[in-house]
A protein has these predicted regions:
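Juxtacatalytic substrate-recognition/specificity segment
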Residues: 1-81, 92, 143
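Stable alpha-helical elements in mature extracytoplasmic
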Residues: 2, 6-13, 57, 61-65, ...
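Residue-level signal for well-ordered alpha-helical scaffold segments within enzymatic catalytic domains
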Residues: 12-19, 68, 91, 95, ...
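Active-site and adjacent substrate-binding regions of carbohydrate-active enzymes
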Residues: 13, 73, 136-137, 161-164, ...
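A generic secondary-structure signal for well-formed alpha-helical elements
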Residues: 21-25, 69-73, 77-78, 92-104, ...
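Surface-exposed patches in mature extracellular/periplasmic domains of secreted proteins
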Residues: 23-32, 77-80, 103-109, 171-172, ...
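Acidic/His/Gly-enriched intrinsically disordered linker/tail segments
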Residues: 80-82, 86-155, 163, 180, ...
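Amphipathic alpha-helical substructures
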Residues: 104, 143-219
Length: 219
């Protein structure tokens, strides 16, 4: 049953992301189950942990598919700029639900939950730094890593989308994907694509998030 569900979701994810970001370039996509909850990715294949409840399993299938675009076709420096693939993939997963109402997952609720979770992380755990662009070894633990790369990366992208509008935002992601396929892209490449499309200077704004000088979650 999980295998059939994963197949249907992966097919929907590939169709959605191909439409939004650019065509999936490989002839096949293989999704394999594995023990635990970890996702392992390679070009044209990824694994999904089977020891998860139904909603988390579905999230993992969608996130893994998004990683084929972000971290697969478009490469990133996963050691120093992990927030690129983590944030883009997580936000893509949320957008999948926005574009596929039959999954009955509210995009707006996901964004509210992400904002609340990040705020609690900042106020309750009081990390010394919320900088996104760090070497993996410079994060104190997995929780800090996930909140400062995946969750905060998603929130940054959503904030930019609200600033520039849907049309410019998704056009810029499609342009970014097309121009950087088969390459290793830097954060500057992403934000340059967005700025070029929307005609706004976002460098100081994005830098404040990346360097940890933003006010998200802070009181």
């Amino acid at each position: 049953e999980k295998a059939e569900s994963a197949l249907k979701t992966a097919v929907s994810a590939v169709a959605t992301f191909s439409r939004l970001f650019g065509e999936y370039p490989y002839e096949y996509l293989s999704v394999a189950g594995s023990p635990g909850a970890e996702i392992c990715n390679a070009s044209g294949i990824y694994t999904v942990g089977e020891d998860q409840n139904e909603s988390l399993f579905t999230d993992s299938v969608i996130f893994g598919a998004a990683r084929q675009w972000w971290g697969g076709v478009v490469g990133f420096d996963a050691v120093n700029c992990a927030f690129m693939q983590e944030g883009l993939s997580e936000y893509s997963a949320s957008v999948f639900y926005e574009k596929n109402a039959n999954y009955s997952v509210s995009f707006d609720e996901r964004m509210r939950d992400a904002t609340l979770s990040y705020s609690l992380f900042v106020t309750e755990l009081k990390p010394k730094s919320t900088a996104m662009q760090r070497k993996i070894c410079d994060f104190n633990n997995e929780t800090e890593y996930l909140f400062c790369t995946r969750l905060k990366g998603e929130l940054l992208l959503h904030s930019i989308r609200k600033t520039v509008g849907d049309k410019a935002f998704f056009e810029s992601l499609k342009s970014f994907y097309g121009e950087n396929s088969g390459k290793v892209a830097s954060p500057d490449c992403l934000f340059a694509s967005i700025e070029k499309t929307c005609g706004k200077n976002l460098k100081s704004y994005s830098d404040s998030w990346i360097n940890g000088n933003d006010v998200v979650g802070k009181t």
